[in-house]
């Protein structure tokens, strides 16, 4: 079953799903802006198109991830994003 989600007044939208190949995941698009997300469980984020500038928990330097690149976020934490262009992503819940 598909589950639609909307965050930050519609600037981030995602569709959650479960499949045998990826497990529980969501795909989405972020409009330009700055966002902070909290995690309940570990997440693996893959940038599909565009780019995300990311500040991960426990780090002091921002890092840019572009299409095809992956980063991991620990559970029970938060991470910060800067988005300069519409960017799509795949989020797997680990």
UniProtKB/Swiss-Prot annotation:
CDD domains: cupin_PpnP-like. SUPFAM superfamilies: RmlC-like cupins. It catalyses: a purine D-ribonucleoside + phosphate = a purine nucleobase + alpha-D-ribose 1-phosphate; adenosine + phosphate = alpha-D-ribose 1-phosphate + adenine; cytidine + phosphate = cytosine + alpha-D-ribose 1-phosphate; guanosine + phosphate = alpha-D-ribose 1-phosphate + guanine. Belongs to the nucleoside phosphorylase PpnP family. Keywords: Glycosyltransferase, Transferase. It is an enzyme of class 2 (transferase). GO terms for cellular component: cytosol. GO terms for molecular function: guanosine phosphorylase activity; purine-nucleoside phosphorylase activity; thymidine phosphorylase activity; uridine phosphorylase activity. Pfam families: Ppnp. Catalyzes the phosphorolysis of diverse nucleosides, yielding D-ribose 1-phosphate and the respective free bases. Can use uridine, adenosine, guanosine, cytidine, thymidine, inosine and xanthosine as substrates. Also catalyzes the reverse reactions. Its EC number is 2.4.2.1, 2.4.2.2. It comes from Salmonella schwarzengrund (strain CVM19633). InterPro entries: Ppnp, RmlC-like_jellyroll, RmlC_Cupin_sf. Transmembrane segments: none annotated. PANTHER family: PYRIMIDINE/PURINE NUCLEOSIDE PHOSPHORYLASE, PYRIMIDINE_PURINE NUCLEOSIDE PHOSPHORYLASE. This is Pyrimidine/purine nucleoside phosphorylase.
């Amino acid at each position: 079953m598909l589950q639609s989600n909307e965050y930050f007044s519609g600037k981030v939208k995602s569709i959650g799903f479960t499949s045998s190949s990826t497990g529980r995941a969501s795909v989405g698009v972020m409009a330009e802006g700055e966002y902070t997300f909290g995690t309940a469980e570990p997440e693996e984020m893959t940038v599909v198109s565009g780019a995300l500038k990311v500040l991960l928990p426990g780090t002091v330097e921002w890092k840019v991830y572009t299409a095809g690149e992956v980063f991991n976020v620990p559970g029970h934490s938060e991470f910060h994003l800067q988005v300069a262009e519409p960017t799509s992503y795949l989020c797997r819940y680990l």
